[in-house]
Each structure stands twice: as C-alpha cells, then as structure tokens.
Design a protein with these regions (language model features):
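Hydrophobic helix-and-loop "lid/oligomerization" segment in the mid-to-C-terminal part
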Residues: 142-195
C-alpha cells in the first residue's frame, strides 16, 4: 500500500511493540479496522468477504463464504484502493470496472490464500487424490529456513522480504492478466454474443 511503502516492518508478537505500530497484520489477536489491526487468530473470528462491504455495489458483492485470513482482511479493507491504480494506469480501463476485478481477484487469488491459511481442504471431507505443494502459500512457506539451516533474525527478515516480493509480484501479475487479457477477451465475447 502506498501509504506504508517506506515503513519499517517489525516482526514480533510482543504486544508492547505491536501497540507502537501503525498497522498490525496476522498477529496480536485483534481484528479492528478502526485501529488497523488485522488478525484472524481468535476463536470468535468468522468474517468472510461475502459480508457487506461499503465500497462494493450490491450487484458486485461477493458471495464467498471462506473465512478470511490476514491476507483476506487486508484485501477486504484495502483491495479496492490497491487495485484502482493498477487498473487505470496504463491499461486504459475505466474505474467503474473496479468492483468486477475486485471480486475476480478474490475468487482467483486471495480466497485460495485465505482457505489454505485457515486449514480448509480443497476437497472438503473427501479424500485428496494428491497434494498441491507448488501454490503460493507453499512457495512462501518454502522460504522459511529448514531446521538445519541458519535461521537467525537477520536471515528470517531477509527471507520475509523475499516472500513479500514473491507474493506481491504474483498479485500484480494476476491483476495484470485480468486487466490486459481477461477483461478485453470478455468484452469481445460479449460483443459477439450481442450480434
């Protein structure tokens, strides 16, 4: 997010340190948008993106029921703001397309992260035929040091930076595909159907 682009990232679970932070994500056991606290690790937490979101027109509101992770919480509150420049700068797409891309990005990118982080199996109660170990969450997890590798604070912080770059790059690429390929193709198909 642009407003935190130059911020220092503090990786801690110390509540006194967290209290000094402008925004706290995935730790602290608090979800409160007013104080910018975005953790989903409470027994009582059950928020989903399908809940009413004030910035999304009713017709475009997602009907998703996957419990949000910290990723989904940040997307819920800042996704529109983050997507707008990516859509309008250089692509020539109208800002009115934002709710459509917001919903599509959740369905095609963020919901998977939410489900995996919350332990939701893709097959529900059915037995899995195979495991997927190459998804974004798995690749981010593979950036953690192995048990027999050096894993001090400096190393972990550097690897966290790599994980942020990986996730951010994939998010940006997914938005790019939607705005430069999916939406233009959809418009062509709709025009052909209308003829």
């Amino acid at each position: 997010m642009p407003q935190w682009a130059g911020s220092t990232i503090v990786r801690t679970r110390n509540l006194e340190e967290l209290a000094k932070c402008d925004i706290v994500i995935d730790v602290g056991a608090v979800y409160d948008h007013a104080t910018k606290r975005y953790d989903h690790h409470q027994r009582t937490f059950s928020s989903v993106l399908g809940e009413v979101h004030p910035d999304v027109p009713e017709a475009s509101r997602p009907d998703f029921s996957t419990k949000l992770s910290a990723c989904g919480l940040v997307y819920k509150h800042y996704g529109m703001e983050h997507l707008l420049p990516a859509l309008t700068e250089g692509s020539g797409l109208p800002a009115s397309l934002l709710p459509v891309i917001y919903k599509k990005m959740y369905k095609g990118f963020v919901e998977e992260v939410d489900a995996i982080d919350n332990g939701v199996d893709i097959a529900g109660d059915a037995p899995l035929k195979y495991r997927v170990n190459t998804n974004l969450s798995a690749r981010v997890g593979q950036l953690n040091p192995a048990w027999n590798e050096e894993g001090g604070k400096e190393c972990r912080n550097a690897l966290f930076g790599e994980a942020m770059a990986l996730a951010g790059g994939e998010f940006k690429a997914a938005v790019g595909r939607l705005s430069t390929s999916w939406w233009p193709a959809r418009a062509i198909v709709e025009a052909a159907v209308d003829k």
